[in-house]
Amino acid sequence: AANQHLCGSHLVEALYLVCGERGFFYSPKTGIVEQCCENPCSLYQLENYCN
């Protein structure tokens, strides 16, 4: 998958898809918004936010 800009609900949906039952921590403090909304990020980067 190509890198994508993911913001707001799109970012949360992508995390649900990537993390599944593991769940994830969504906090602006983790830098995920800078990494995936302001800049394009990969699914591999999203996996860093799974529990």
Curated annotation (Swiss-Prot):
SUPFAM superfamilies cross-referenced by the UniProt entry: Insulin-like
Disulfide pattern: C7-C37, C19-C50, C36-C41
Compartmental location: Secreted
A single Gene Ontology CC term: extracellular space
GO biological process per UniProt: glucose metabolic process
Keyword DNA damage part of the UniProt annotation: no
GO molecular function, one term: hormone activity
Keywords assigned by UniProt, alphabetized: Carbohydrate metabolism, Disulfide bond, Glucose metabolism, Hormone, Secreted
Subunit comment: Heterodimer of a B chain and an A chain linked by two disulfide bonds.
Protein name listed in UniProt: Insulin
Taxonomy of the source species: Eukaryota, Metazoa, Chordata, Craniata, Vertebrata
Protein's gene: INS
